[in-house]
């Protein structure tokens, strides 16, 4: 923790610098950042799992306590208003006592509706950052999530501090242990539900603590891109396993995917080809490279795989130009990663929030930025047998280029995705996922 504490001091200094700069530009006195409030289920007395405002947890790892507030102006010591009610029904969060607390002036709040007593007296020139605009209005904030402030912060969130990079390494290290446990469970005959339990146990996090709903897909379920159901029964014949699962550390996410074949066969060879292609794409990452160019390079590699594995005929560029590769690889190559799994800033050209749209032919690409040092991105090429997309090819002449017999043979395996989390450095790439123990 000493290393993290050392990096944290510089992290807070950088956040204060960013705040001071945008406040000066926008002639604001400061920012009031709300952690959030509980959300009650409809017609019930149970709350949905609480998720803290990412702008709040960028400053400190208070992740599970609603009704907290940060008051920052880039000059003075940030003020943390920490919610600690008198409550005999629920566990009350302990007063923080960690390496980061020395950087905050901490005040305790016992009643959520009394927060105005601890906030700046005149909020007219302060900006509220958070979800609950009705609360902000009652408290007198006329500036609520102002575009100029949000665009500036989102643009700079893509450049990670050393503290953030270390948190993300630890999130990867934790997730790798879960992936290894899940892989072992798959080869030992576990069901999707059982594999999920092995994963969560290995990472030591609950379903509400991991950064997103795990994808644990056996056989043809791997063709469903965001498959989050969990079958309790093992399939009669075990063919393949796709796992897309991450872990959290101090609010930062990892997002890792692997695909396995149960036996050595043609599908296993296709996984090996995808693994090779993914590593080649990662080698292409460097400052100054346009992320959409990496996405287009992925389609070229997918096209070659379609030809090599007798899934399609023709020439590779023609398969891309006709949209045939998009039927087999319909999603983007990856996205920014950080406080959120699909982190903000992926389309921002500048601090003003100028939007760089995804290419028209690739609308699901989540990042159009030019790569720069200390950015963290996922790299997740895939190839799937998705009938709804392939049926579109059958409706025109493109269907004549598809070897439907090979498609039928691979359909029971679902699909392949391989995903690593990569830091772009000035002179190298740091593949956190592989370097921390998940070689394949």
Curated annotation (Swiss-Prot):
Organism: Shewanella sp. (strain W3-18-1)
Family: Belongs to the peptidase M24B family. Bacterial-type prolidase subfamily.
UniProt KW keywords: Dipeptidase, Hydrolase, Manganese, Metal-binding, Metalloprotease, Protease
Name of the molecule in the record: Xaa-Pro dipeptidase
Role this protein plays: Splits dipeptides with a prolyl residue in the C-terminal position.
Keyword Magnesium tagged: no
Cofactor note: Binds 2 manganese ions per subunit.
Chemical reaction(s) catalysed: Xaa-L-Pro dipeptide + H2O = an L-alpha-amino acid + L-proline
Residues annotated for Mn(2+) 2 binding in this entry: 244, 255, 419
UniProt EC number: 3.4.13.9
Residues noted as binding Mn(2+) 1 in the record, renumbered to the chain: 255, 335, 380, 419
GO cellular component: cytosol
InterPro entries: Creatin/AminoP/Spt16_N, Creatinase/aminopeptidase-like, PepQ_N, Pept_M24, Peptidase_M24B_aminopep-P_CS, X-Pro_dipept-like, X_Pro_dipept
Highest taxon in the source lineage: Bacteria
Cofactor(s) needed: Mn(2+)
Record GO terms (molecular function): aminopeptidase activity; metal ion binding; metalloexopeptidase activity; phosphoric triester hydrolase activity; proline dipeptidase activity
């Amino acid at each position: 923790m000493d290393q993290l504490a050392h990096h944290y001091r510089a992290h807070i200094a950088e956040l204060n610098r960013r705040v001071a700069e945008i406040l000066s530009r926008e002639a604001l006195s400061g920012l009031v950042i709300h952690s959030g409030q509980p959300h009650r289920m409809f017609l019930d007395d149970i709350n949905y799992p609480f998720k803290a405002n990412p702008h709040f947890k960028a400053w400190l790892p208070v992740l599970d306590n609603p009704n907290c507030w940060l008051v920052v102006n880039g000059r003075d010591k940030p003020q943390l208003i920490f919610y600690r009610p008198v409550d005999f029904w629920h566990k009350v969060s302990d007063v923080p006592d960690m390496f980061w607390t020395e950087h905050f002036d901490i005040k305790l709040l016992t009643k959520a509706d009394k927060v105005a007593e601890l906030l700046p007296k005149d909020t007219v020139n302060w900006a509220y950052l958070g979800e609950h605009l009705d609360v902000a209005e009652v408290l007198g904030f006329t500036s609520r999530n102002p575009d100029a402030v949000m665009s500036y912060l989102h643009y700079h969130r893509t450049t990670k501090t050393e503290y953030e990079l270390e948190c993300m390494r630890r999130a990867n290290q934790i997730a790798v242990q879960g992936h290894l446990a899940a892989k072992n469970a798959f080869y030992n005959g576990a069901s999707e539900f059982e594999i999920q339990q092995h994963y969560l146990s290995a990472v030591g996090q609950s379903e509400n603590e991991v950064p997103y709903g795990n994808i644990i897909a056996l056989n043809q379920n791997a063709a469903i891109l965001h498959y989050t159901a969990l079958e309790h029964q093992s399939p009669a014949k075990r063919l393949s396993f796709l796992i897309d699962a991450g872990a959290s550390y101090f609010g930062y996410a990892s997002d890792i995917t692997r695909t396995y074949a149960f036996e050595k066969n043609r599908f296993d060879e296709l996984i090996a080809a995808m693994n090779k292609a993914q590593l080649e794409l990662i080698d292409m990452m460097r400052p100054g490279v346009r992320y959409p160019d990496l996405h287009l390079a992925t389609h070229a590699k997918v096209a070659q795989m379609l030809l090599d594995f007798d899934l399609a005929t023709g020439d590779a560029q023609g398969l891309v130009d006709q949209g045939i590769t998009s039927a087999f690889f319909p999603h983007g190559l990856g996205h920014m990663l950080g406080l959120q799994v699909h982190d903000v800033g992926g389309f921002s050209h500048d601090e003003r929030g100028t939007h760089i749209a995804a290419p028209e032919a690739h609308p699901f690409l989540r990042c159009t930025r030019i790569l720069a040092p200390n950015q963290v991105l996922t790299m997740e090429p895939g190839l799937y047998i998705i009938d709804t997309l392939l049926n579109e090819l059958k409706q025109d002449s493109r269907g004549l280029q598809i070897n439907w017999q090979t498609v039928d043979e691979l359909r029971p395996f679902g699909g392949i995705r391989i995903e690593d989390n990569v830091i772009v450095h000035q002179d190298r790439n740091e593949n956190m996922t592989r370097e921390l123990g998940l070689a394949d």
